[in-house]
A protein has these predicted regions:
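N-terminal active-site segment of His-dependent metallophosphoesterases
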Residues: 1-65, 76-78, 146-152, 238
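Binuclear metal-dependent phosphoesterase catalytic core
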Residues: 2-3, 98-103, 132, 183-188, ...
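Active-site neighborhood of phospho(di)ester-bond hydrolases with catalytic His/Asp-centered motifs
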Residues: 8-10, 38-43, 67-73, 91-95, ...
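Basic, amphipathic N-terminal segments that precede the first structured/catalytic domain
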Residues: 10, 53-60, 66-89, 98-100, ...
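Conserved catalytic scaffold of divalent metal-dependent phosphoesterases
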Residues: 12-14, 78-172, 215-216
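Active-site environment of divalent metal-dependent phosphoester hydrolases
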Residues: 13-19, 45-50, 73-81, 97-101, ...
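Charged helix-capping and loop-helix junction motifs
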Residues: 22-24, 51-59, 86, 90, ...
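Short, electropositive alpha-helical surface patch
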Residues: 57-64, 164-180, 206-218
């Protein structure tokens, strides 16, 4: 059965956890763990602070595999283009798909900020039409997932696509931290990488599909995860 190993992290919130990221990456590279892709599931920087990107670039330059990321809520949408220009080593996916051919395995990746079932107060106040934007994004993600053709399928999504990941956070705010409406989206993939919930669960399974919360403040480390084809339906019994 085909499989790949990936390294994954998120919620660096530079400068807040930048030193931790630097130290953990150095440790990872010293151990010579083999991985084929490096994933960052959003929030590289804190509150849109683009001045931190040069520091991120200096740290990640030692990574010699493709670096794929989605944006988080701290990478403000109006700054996406500038972030892409300032971080040429990172391939950012914003409701987009990417196909990587690695060791004769076709890895299909969809990346997105994700959706909230209820926009936050700040979002409702500062982003006109945010609820409609989330509905349209959800539709696009389902459309992309249906069209994705690959040996292995990976979803990178900053906001958790299930409240189960949020357990450990204040349940009062679950609807403003993730989306249960995207739970069915998970079934299209072999692995889901999410973040945002610094006090959430590290790993949950949804209909047999693993959802890893790779938030750096939660894990205190960069995770090495194996992605393999998930057997579905009757296949799972044989």
């Amino acid at each position: 059965m085909s499989s790949l190993r990936i390294a994954a992290t998120a919620d660096i919130h530079a400068p807040l956890y930048l030193d931790m990221f630097k130290d953990r990456l150095e440790d990872l590279l010293k151990k010579e763990h083999k991985f084929s892709v490096f994933i960052i599931a959003g929030d590289l920087i804190e509150r849109g602070d683009l001045s931190q990107l040069s520091k991120i670039n200096e740290i990640i330059r030692k990574i010699n595999v493709p670096i794929i990321a989605c944006f988080g809520n701290n990478e403000y949408e109006e700054k996406e283009s500038e972030i892409r220009k300032k971080c040429p080593m990172i391939r950012f996916l914003s409701d987009q798909m990417e196909i990587l051919n690695i060791h004769e395995i076709k890895l299909g990746i969809i990346g997105s900020r994700g959706c909230l079932d209820q926009p936050t107060f700040w979002q409702r106040k500062n982003i006109p039409g945010i609820a409609t934007m989330y509905r349209n994004r959800a539709k696009r993600l389902y459309d992309l997932a249906r069209r994705l053709q690959a040996d292995l399928k990976l979803l990178i999504i900053h906001y958790p696509p299930s409240y189960r990941v949020l357990e450990g956070e204040n349940s009062k705010y679950f609807s403003q931290m993730g989306s249960n409406k995207l739970e069915k989206l998970v079934s299209y993939f072999d692995l889901v990488i999410t973040a945002h919930a610094h006090n959430g669960r590290k790993l949950v399974f949804l209909n047999g599909i693993p959802i890893y919360n790779v938030a750096l403040p939660l894990n205190k480390d960069i995770l090495i995860i194996e992605i393999e084809k998930r057997r579905k339906g009757l296949e799972a019994f044989f």
